[in-house]
Every structure is written in structure tokens, then in C-alpha cells.
């Protein structure tokens, strides 16, 4: 990265097929296109953006970048990390961040106090449906994706983002929260299931081997988003890829380049396993709409109407 390596190394989601280790190789392809077209800055298209890491990488080489994904969480991630806040907007974001995190901390202290007093009431559906009530006494009927503290934090933070943050800035706070929710989950990387005790079938943090407990039980903390400031214009689409590539709307963003993209990156799902169910939790946090408990799977709590592509 030319200026800030933290932009490519932090606030990422844990993701199947993440291409972070291949960025240098992808960069070789970028150089080929630059040399062939005799252009330093390219118009770029990422049709299956996923975690957004390739789009972040391409941003430094782009005058225009258009990205797409069928999943809402991916779109929010790209809206945040491909943006170019002005100096004034950065100041506003920092002020909002300080106020927001202070409110989250106050609310979490209140919740922790209520736990100690035995008057705890879950603050939202993540703690209600996807976390045990007591980490030391997990019941067979309870899902175990997050520690009680982290589930409470996700609910509190997401609710306050919804009520306290202006619409145009929400993605800049939801995206870092999605990263934390991805990292500090009691899973091996996808949300199809959570670690359990194989003998009892009861949820257990880290499973029998107590794997990755530092990661799983570490407290979630909302971070200020990382940005890479340049003159690249970004456009985020939330469409079926087959429909997007034939739509006039897509090519309007590169009308100043003859309606064509210099470089198109296609990285479709590598197998039949659907991302809509593998990462359903991130979509729940993205929309923050409580699922109908009659319409979610019994074991993992996956919404039955997840996106199918």
C-alpha cells in the first residue's frame, strides 16, 4: 500500500476465500493493465466484493471503482471503507464516535451492574437468541455464538448507531462493528454453527479443545473506521451479478471513460455453499431487524429466507 498499510490489515471480516494473501499477485495484473493502457489510474469493477479487501487494494490504483455484492453486510463494508471523507466530515465522524462510544460504555456498565444484581434483562435479539444467559451454565437449548458480554455489546452498539448516527454516516460505524462481530464469534469462521462440547452437544466456547479462546472471549470494542484518502470515486451496488453486468446503471459511472471499465475483477463463490447462510449473522447486524423465531432454523437460528444466488 502506498500510504497506510493498516487500511489493508485492520477491520476486516473473517471470510471464506479472502484474497488478502493474493493482493501482491493481483497487483501484478493491475500493472499489466496500467502498462497496456498507459494509465496510472484505472476505472475498476469488483463484481463479487465479499469482504471488500480486493476493492480496498484496487482503490489506490483507481479513478473510479464500482463494487457489487448480493449481501447487505458487504455493501455496508464497502460504503464505509471505500469512502473519502472530507476534513469536515472526518471531524464530524470523530465527534460522533466519541459521543457514541461513551454512550455504549455507560449502557454496558449499567447492564453489567444489573447482571451482578440479578436484575438483568437482555437488551436485544442478539443476546436473546444467539448467546447463552450465563457463560458458566450454558443450556442445551441455547445458541452460543457470542459471550453474554459481546452479545449485549452488539445489541447496545447497533441500537445506538441506529438512533444516534445520521443516515449518511451509519455505514462508517456499522462496518467496524461487523468486523468485531466476525472476529469475536464462537465459530471457526462461518456462522453455520458454533463450537460445542461434542459429548453433550451443548454450546461451549472454543469447543472440546477450547480453541482460540482469546479471540472468542475477548471483548468487542467499536473502533473508529480506517480510511484511505484519494481522489477515487466509489459506487456500491447490491444486485445479482448477472443482472448488474447487463444494466445501463453500472456503465453510467464510467461514462467519462467511454462507458467501459479498464479492469474487471470477477471472484464468484468458490463452491456451492451460500454466503447468505454462512454469514447470516452479519446480515442480521447490518439490518438489525429481529428475525421471526418461527422462521429461523432451530440449531443455528438462520433465517429461512436468506439470499440464494
Q: What role is predicted for each listed range?
A:
Residues 34-41, 111-118, 245-261:
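Intrinsically disordered, low-complexity coil segments
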Residues 61, 83-84, 253-257, 276, ...:
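Glycine-rich, phosphate-binding/catalytic loops in enzymes
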Residues 63-68:
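Short beta-strand element of Class I
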Amino acid at each position: 500500500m502506498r500510504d497506510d498499510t493498516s487500511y489493508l490489515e485492520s477491520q476486516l471480516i473473517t471470510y471464506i476465500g479472502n484474497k488478502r494473501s493474493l493482493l501482491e499477485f493481483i497487483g501484478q495484473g493491475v500493472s499489466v493493465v496500467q502498462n497496456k493502457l498507459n494509465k496510472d489510474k484505472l476505472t475498476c469493477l469488483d463484481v463479487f466484493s465479499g469482504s471488500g479487501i480486493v476493492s480496498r487494494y484496487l482503490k489506490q490504483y483507481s479513478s473510479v471503482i464500482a463494487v457489487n455484492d448480493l449481501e447487505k453486510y458487504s455493501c455496508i463494508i464497502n460504503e464505509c471503507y471505500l469512502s473519502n471523507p472530507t476534513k469536515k466530515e472526518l471531524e464530524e465522524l470523530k465527534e460522533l464516535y466519541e459521543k457514541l462510544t461513551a454512550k455504549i460504555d455507560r449502557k454496558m456498565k449499567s447492564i453489567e451492574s444489573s447482571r451482578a444484581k440479578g436484575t438483568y434483562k437482555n437488551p436485544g435479539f442478539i443476546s436473546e437468541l444467539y448467546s447463552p444467559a450465563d457463560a458458566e451454565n450454558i443450556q442445551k437449548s441455547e445458541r452460543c455464538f457470542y459471550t453474554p458480554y459481546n452479545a449485549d455489546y452488539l445489541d447496545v452498539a447497533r441500537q445506538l448507531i441506529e438512533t444516534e448516527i445520521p443516515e449518511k454516516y451509519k455505514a462508517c460505524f456499522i462496518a467496524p462493528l461487523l468486523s468485531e462481530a466476525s472476529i469475536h464469534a464462537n465459530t471457526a469462521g462461518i456462522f453455520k454453527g458454533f463450537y460445542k462440547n461434542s459429548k453433550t452437544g451443548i454450546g461451549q466456547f472454543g469447543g472440546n479443545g477450547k480453541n482460540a479462546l482469546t479471540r472468542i472471549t475477548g471483548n468487542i470494542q467499536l473502533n473508529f473506521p480506517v480510511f484511505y484518502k484519494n481522489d477515487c470515486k466509489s459506487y456500491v451496488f447490491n444486485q445479482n451479478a448477472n443482472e448488474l453486468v447487463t444494466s445501463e446503471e453500472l456503465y453510467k459511472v464510467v461514462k467519462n471513460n467511454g462507458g467501459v471499465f479498464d479492469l474487471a475483477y470477477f471472484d464468484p463463490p468458490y463452491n456451492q455453499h451460500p454466503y447468505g447462510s454462512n454469514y447470516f449473522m452479519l446480515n442480521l447486524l447490518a439490518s438489525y431487524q429481529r428475525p421471526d423465531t418461527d422462521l429461523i432454523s432451530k440449531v443455528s437460528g438462520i433465517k429461512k429466507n436468506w439470499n440464494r444466488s
